[in-house]
Structures are given as structure tokens and as C-alpha cells.
């Protein structure tokens, strides 16, 4: 059986996390040549490349498996040494989360865990359609995703759904939709997307108004909180989780442009199996809070 030296695995992990050999060397306090040598040792051991040497480097399929193994072992090792029960070194937890969860329910859900255990979070923000891929690549130990099926050697639980409403300010609605939300009016109304791969707005318009993707003007803004600000100031119409704008809707600062229509995204919590004690606490906290604030039907 091929048993990798975890020192060499940490070199592979550093290259991926630091997005290059030079910064990985600085992180590990060794030379860049030593980093390359350790990864070469790993590749010789497994008889195949573990890195695709692009900019930034990315792991091969075998490299992803090894990184996942490393992160799981590190979690279990830290807990075995007692670092999650009063030890001096905070336990690093890398999680992939979507921006809307981070802006609404995720941090309150994690509050009791953070208060109870010395944890250092590394939250990697990614669209909910792509967070599971970070888990597959071994970059994180848990992910909030819309994918219901678990990866091999992983566990999954349903968290609940975020309901997205198509909203804008009243002045925006009066300007762009004086006769209601129509197909022709939507073609002129500025919208906003999180990034070029965010299809939430386009999917809603295609499903309900038969508008093809790319047919409406769309800003690109990588911030869930900025979506709310853009809508409040009358700059755009956009899809925002109901959970995020309850106060604005109640006060009339924002209005639901299409009552009776919404976009529902069911969320799932993925993580490696077996769970460490700390990850079990995280899972319990996310499931408990998610079932209080997310739609369960």
C-alpha cells in the first residue's frame, strides 16, 4: 500500500492554497526548490501527476483525493491532541459557502460552535452550484450546495430552502414597469448578477417570461449585501432571498414585483465521512438553525 509522507502532502496543499510554488515556499518556510522536490516525491510514489501546472496550479483527480485525505486526517489529529477541547491552537475549518447563505443564516447558525470551540474559519465563497466542487478538490472539509447527491466518502443532509423574490424599489418599478412587469419592459430594466456564471435572474425570467439568457442588461457585483443596496437605491431589479429583505419588504422600501412567483433553492450540507467531533458540532448547528429559518417544504 502506498503511504504518503504527510509533510509532502502539506507541500501539495500549500501550492493549491497559496496558488503557486513561491508563496507555498514562504508559507512553509522552505525554499521553492524544496517544495518542488516534495511534490515530485509524491508524484513518483503514485506514478502520476498530482498537479496541473497552470496559473494558478490545480490538483489532478488523484491530487484531489490526497488533499481530501490530508484535511480529514488533520481534523482528526487536531482533535486527538485535544485542540478542540481547550488547546492553544485554533482548529482550522475550511468551508465552501454561497454568498446568500453567508449574508443571511450561516453566521448565526455557527455562533454557538464558535463560542464553544477554538475554531478558525476559512469561509470560501462560491456559487451554490459550484461549492461541492471545492469539496471534491479537497480544498474544504464541508460545503453548502444545491446538489442533493453526496460525493464518494461524503455525507449529506438537507438544510432547507432559500426563497428568492424579484424585487425593486417603488421608484424603479414606477420608472421601468408603469404597466406592470411585462416581457418588453424587462428587456430595458437593469438587473444584477453575482458573477458571469450566476444564472438565477436569467433562469427566473426565462421560466416566467420566456426571455432568453443574455437578453436583459445586467451588472456584475460579487456581493449579496450590494444586491440589497442596489435595489434600495433604485439602480436595479434583482432576485434576493426573502430572508434577507424581510424588513425592507415590510416597510415598503422594496416591493415584490411578481407576487406569487419566486425562485426556490434547496440547500444541502456536504462533508467528509467519518465526521470529526468538531464537524459533528458544525453539522448539528447548521441543521438545527437551518430548520428554524429555511423553508422545509
From Swiss-Prot:
Molecular functions per Gene Ontology = DNA binding; DNA-binding transcription factor activity
Q: What interactions and quaternary structure are annotated? A: Homodimer.
Q: State the DNA-binding region(s).
A: 21-40
Keyword Cell cycle on this protein? no
Could you list this entry's UniProt keywords, alphabetically sorted: DNA-binding, Transcription, Transcription regulation
* Taxonomic source organism: Yersinia enterocolitica serotype O:8 / biotype 1B (strain NCTC 13174 / 8081)
- Ranges for domain HTH lysR-type come to 4-60
> What is the protein's name according to its record?
HTH-type transcriptional regulator ArgP
Q: Does the keyword Manganese apply?
A: no
Report the function annotation for this chain.
Controls the transcription of genes involved in arginine and lysine metabolism.
What PANTHER family has UniProt attached to this entry?
HTH-TYPE TRANSCRIPTIONAL REGULATOR ARGP, TRANSCRIPTIONAL REGULATOR
The text of the family note is: Belongs to the LysR transcriptional regulatory family.
Amino acid at each position: 500500500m502506498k503511504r504518503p509522507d504527510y509533510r509532502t502532502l502539506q507541500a501539495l496543499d500549500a501550492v493549491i492554497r497559496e496558488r503557486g510554488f513561491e508563496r507555498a515556499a514562504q508559507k512553509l518556510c522552505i525554499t521553492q526548490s524544496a517544495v518542488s522536490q516534495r511534490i515530485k516525491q509524491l508524484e513518483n510514489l503514485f506514478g502520476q501527476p498530482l498537479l496541473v501546472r497552470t496559473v494558478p496550479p490545480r490538483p489532478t483527480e488523484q491530487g484531489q483525493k490526497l488533499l481530501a485525505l490530508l484535511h480529514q486526517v488533520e481534523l482528526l489529529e487536531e482533535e486527538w491532541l485535544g485542540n478542540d477541547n481547550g488547546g492553544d491552537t485554533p482548529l482550522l475549518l475550511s468551508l465552501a459557502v454561497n454568498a446568500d447563505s453567508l449574508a443571511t443564516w450561516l453566521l448565526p447558525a455557527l455562533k454557538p460552535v464558535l463560542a464553544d470551540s477554538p475554531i478558525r474559519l476559512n469561509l470560501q465563497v462560491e456559487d451554490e452550484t459550484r461549492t461541492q466542487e471545492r469539496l471534491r478538490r479537497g480544498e474544504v472539509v464541508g460545503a453548502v450546495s444545491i446538489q442533493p447527491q453526496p460525493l464518494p466518502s461524503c455525507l449529506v443532509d438537507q438544510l432547507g430552502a432559500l426563497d428568492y423574490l424579484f424585487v425593486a424599489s417603488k421608484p424603479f418599478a414606477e420608472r421601468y414597469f408603469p404597466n406592470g412587469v411585462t416581457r418588453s419592459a424587462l428587456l430595458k430594466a437593469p438587473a444584477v448578477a453575482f458573477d458571469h456564471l450566476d444564472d438565477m435572474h436569467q433562469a427566473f425570467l426565462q421560466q416566467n417570461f420566456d426571455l432568453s439568457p443574455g437578453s436583459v442588461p445586467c451588472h456584475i457585483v460579487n456581493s449579496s449585501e450590494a444586491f440589497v443596496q442596489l435595489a434600495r437605491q433604485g439602480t436595479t431589479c434583482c432576485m434576493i432571498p426573502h430572508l434577507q429583505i424581510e424588513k425592507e419588504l415590510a416597510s415598503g422600501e422594496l416591493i415584490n414585483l411578481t407576487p406569487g412567483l419566486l425562485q426556490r433553492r434547496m440547500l444541502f450540507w456536504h462533508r467528509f465521512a467519518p465526521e470529526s467531533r468538531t464537524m459533528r458540532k458544525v453539522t448539528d448547528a447548521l441543521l438545527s438553525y437551518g430548520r428554524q429559518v429555511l423553508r422545509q417544504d
